[in-house]
Amino acid sequence: MKGPTTALLYLDAVSVTFDGFRALNALSLVLEPGEMRAIIGPNGAGKTTMMDVITGKTRPDQGDVLFASGEVDLTTLDEAEIARLGIGRKFQKPTVFEAHSVLDNLRLALACDRRAWKSALWRDSAEERARIDEILGIVRLGDHVDRLAGGLSHGQKQWLEIGMLLAQDPKLLLVDEPVAGMTDAETAQTAILLREINRERTVVVVEHDMDFVRDLGVRVTCLHEGSVLSEGSLDQVSSDERVIEVYLGR
């Protein structure tokens, strides 16, 4: 495995145990700046725990978790410090402020120390509004700027939450099952959206939808029992007999 010198994210021999269950078992993973990686694997493979470790929610029992060419040891930081460092996480279920407009949701993300009731009184600077307009374009919500977030479709809520993360200008974006529950059209748009985001940011996508992973066209890592089982293109990974046996089936 490559060293941490050039890697944006470097995990080496990371292990996590919960009540005797080893959720991560000497997991090693390297992400280069500007890369998008798809993470697949059966339930219980360690995908969520891996993201918990990266974001500071869970402390590993052992192993290295380094960021920014090895300059930052993420195991020494809490969740808020890691978020400020530039690591954003999108959970599977969208969490947006449903009683507020799309615009106000993005305003809140740009100034996350403000209270929701203040956002309507906040006057955008030209720079802030330009940034919001840019994000609206990326997440396909430019025509819904004044719409309440609660009135959006499930897919649009997912896009809005991704937009809220983009407003915080992350270097690394972790996205958990972004197309679960989406229509086919929304799924196709999400693949395009993530590829656009990947032009400027490193992205990790945890996903079970293999058609969606194929649309992404990126390197794939399959986890099993807390370790990397297989890695390569989707064709390489999906033809691996070990992956077929434990995950894809015949």
Over which residues does each language-model region extend?
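Catalytic Walker B motif of ABC-type/P-loop ATPase nucleotide-binding domains
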Residues: 173-177
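Conserved ABC nucleotide-binding domain
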Residues: 74-76, 135-151, 156
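ABC ATPase NBD Q-loop/coupling interface
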Residues: 64-84, 122-123
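Conserved ABC ATPase "signature" region
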Residues: 119-144, 192
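Helix-to-loop junction immediately C-terminal to a conserved catalytic motif
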Residues: 55
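The feature captures the beta-strand-to-loop junction immediately N-terminal to the Walker
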Residues: 40-42
